[in-house]
C-alpha cells in the first residue's frame, strides 16, 4: 500500500494506492503551525475510518509547495509509518526533460502534473491546475517540459476585490446566468468568473500558438475549481481530478529503488 501526499497552499490531499487502484483519498487543511503530532492524529484517524491499517503502508511519496510545513510533515510520516518518504524535488527521476532556465525553480506540483500528463496522454499537452495559484504548463509529446505561466488563483482574485474595495461584499464562486447583471453580487460573480474564463481561453490560445508543431495540444484541467471553469469553456478538453495523485504514483514507481 502506497501513501501519496500532495501538500498545497490551501489543502493537503492524501491518497492510498493498492493493488493497482486508488482505494481512498482525503483532503485536509494546510496549517503552517500544525505540529507533527496533530498531523499524525488526523492521518491515522482517516486510515482507521476506511478500515486501513497504517502498518500496511510500504512506501510514501510527498509533493509540497509549502516549505514551512515540511519538517512537521516528514517527522509525522517517519514516526507513523517507519518509512523514509520520497520527496519530489531536485535529483528525483522524472522521465521528462525540464527546459526551464533553472530547473530547480519548477514547483513540485507542476513537475508531478507534467509527469502524469506525459505518461498518460502520450501527446503534446497543456496542463491547467486550478489551485491557490493557477498554473499553466506545456509538455511536448517527447516529454520536454517547456514551461508555462502562473496566475493568481480564482479565489485569490475574488478575495482581493473584497479586501481592497470597501463597499463590495465577499461572494460565492458561482457562474451567473448572464454577463450583464442587475445586482452587486451577480455583477461581481460575472466579472470574476467570466473574466477568469477569458483569461484561461486567451492563455491557452497563445500557448497553442507557441507550441505549434502540427499536433494540436490536448488541454487538461485539474485542481479544486477545474470543473467550475471547464463547464463554461471549450478551451479545456478534459478534467482529470486525479492527475496529481497519478503523477505521484508514477514518480514513486520510478524512484522506489
Swiss-Prot record:
EC number: 2.7.1.33
Protein's job: Catalyzes the phosphorylation of pantothenate (Pan), the first step in CoA biosynthesis.
Compartment annotation: Cytoplasm
Family label: Belongs to the type III pantothenate kinase family.
Biological process (GO), any one: coenzyme A biosynthetic process
InterPro entries named in the record: ATPase_NBD (IPR043129), Type_III_PanK (IPR004619)
Pathway per the UniProt entry: Cofactor biosynthesis; coenzyme A biosynthesis; CoA from (R)-pantothenate: step 1/5
Keywords (A to Z) from UniProt: ATP-binding, Coenzyme A biosynthesis, Cytoplasm, Kinase, Metal-binding, Nucleotide-binding, Potassium, Transferase
HAMAP family associated with the record: Pantothen_kinase_3
Active-site residues (renumbered): 109
GO CC terms, sorted: cytoplasm
Protein origin, superkingdom: Bacteria
Residues at which substrate binds: 100, 107-110, 184
Name the UniProt record assigns to this protein: Type III pantothenate kinase
Cofactor: NH4(+); K(+)
Binding site for K(+): 129
Amino acid at each position: 500500500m502506497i501513501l501519496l501526499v500532495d501538500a498545497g497552499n490551501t489543502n493537503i490531499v492524501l491518497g492510498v494506492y493498492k493493488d493497482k487502484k486508488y482505494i481512498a483519498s482525503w483532503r485536509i487543511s494546510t496549517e503552517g503551525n500544525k505540529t507533527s503530532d496533530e498531523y499524525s492524529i488526523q492521518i491515522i484517524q482517516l486510515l482507521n475510518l476506511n478500515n486501513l491499517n497504517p502498518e500496511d503502508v510500504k512506501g510514501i511519496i510527498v509533493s509540497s509547495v509549502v516549505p514551512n510545513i515540511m519538517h512537521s510533515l516528514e517527522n509525522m510520516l517517519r514516526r507513523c509509518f517507519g518509512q523514509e518518504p520520497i520527496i519530489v524535488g531536485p535529483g528525483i527521476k522524472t522521465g521528462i526533460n525540464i527546459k526551464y532556465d533553472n530547473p530547480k525553480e519548477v514547483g513540485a506540483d507542476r513537475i508531478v502534473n507534467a509527469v502524469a500528463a506525459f505518461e498518460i496522454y502520450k501527446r503534446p499537452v497543456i496542463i491547467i491546475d486550478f489551485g491557490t495559484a493557477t498554473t499553466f504548463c506545456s509538455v511536448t509529446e517527447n516529454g520536454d517540459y517547456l514551461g508555462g505561466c502562473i496566475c493568481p488563483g480564482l479565489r485569490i482574485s475574488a478575495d482581493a476585490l473584497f479586501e481592497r474595495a470597501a463597499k463590495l461584499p465577499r461572494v460565492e464562486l458561482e457562474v451567473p446566468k448572464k454577463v450583464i447583471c442587475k445586482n452587486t453580487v451577480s455583477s461581481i460573480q460575472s466579472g470574476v468568473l467570466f473574466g477568469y474564463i477569458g483569461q484561461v481561453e486567451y492563455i491557452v490560445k497563445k500557448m497553442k500558438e507557441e507550441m505549434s508543431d502540427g499536433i494540436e495540444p490536448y488541454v487538461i484541467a485539474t485542481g479544486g475549481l477545474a470543473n467550475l471553469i471547464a463547464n463554461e469553456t471549450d478551451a479545456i478538453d478534459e478534467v482529470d481530478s486525479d492527475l496529481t495523485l497519478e503523477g505521484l504514483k508514477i514518480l514513486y514507481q520510478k524512484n522506489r529503488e
